[in-house]
Amino acid sequence: VCSSDLAAAKAAGPSATPSAASSVLAKHRQELGTLASTLPFFAYTACFLLAPTVIVVVGAFQDRSGGFTLSNFNKMFEANTVAAFGTSILVSVASSVIGAVVGALASYALVIGAKPNGLLRRMISAISSVLAQFGGVMLAFAFIATIGINGIGTMLIKTLTGYTVNPNWLSSLPGLITIYCYFQIPLMIIIFLPAVDSIRPQWREACESLGGNTFQYWTRVACPILAPRFISAFLLLFASAFSAYATAAALFSQRSILVPLMIQGAMRNEMDPNQQGFAQVLAFAMIIVVAIVMLLSHAVEKRAGRWQ
């Protein structure tokens, strides 16, 4: 028996070697294919994300001649700069809270009121995907044409009720927050809908079988599971609103009440040559704020990942 096994092993040896070699070659080809498919993404990220970040960080510590300086940071703690950061944070927090709450309620209503693959679910998901990207000058123009000084909605309200809408409302902070909610709510639906989908009906049945009521189910089961994802989504909404520029620029063309608008004013300033460096400092500060928010979002997302 031993001699026959030895003979079989010797016979299988030469044929097994090419098979192992072919598997190694196939593995290398797969790795090369993966690298080739991801290379454009890394190139795009390096060109349009990493390189601008490096330019901003380096430029914040350079003077006009390219030497190292800290004078660009002198205006960071002036009253108008602090006010711009405070206003940006206020608008971002307010629009994010409204967008997160309304979007979460809409996601829950969509889960319990529509079939997973139904027409209503697909339509709302598609519309939310479009509206989440509908910002900038187009969004500002849409609101101006609707409820601006001579907007269709403004004229209709005046004709039907005699009430005249405040012509400066769109150029106020409540108006800006309302406009931001137009893309914050759909973005929240896209982000939070998978989290609500992950809640299993068996968990509620188990809670009820153990004598729990609806309040106990939400406070001890559903909310602890959804809270990390809700906080993570809120932080993403905050980062989105904090870095938004085009919509506010179309409404506040001559007022630097937000940090992105202050950066625009500093870049266009031709009277003070040091304003270019100050613009880099403002952008650097925005990068720090957004980076902190994204790190917090990632930490919360890791905790929520075990339930997905």
Segments from the language model and where they lie:
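Short, small-residue-biased leader/transition segments that mark boundaries at the very start
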Residues: 1-3
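Non-cytoplasmic
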Residues: 52-56, 188, 229-264
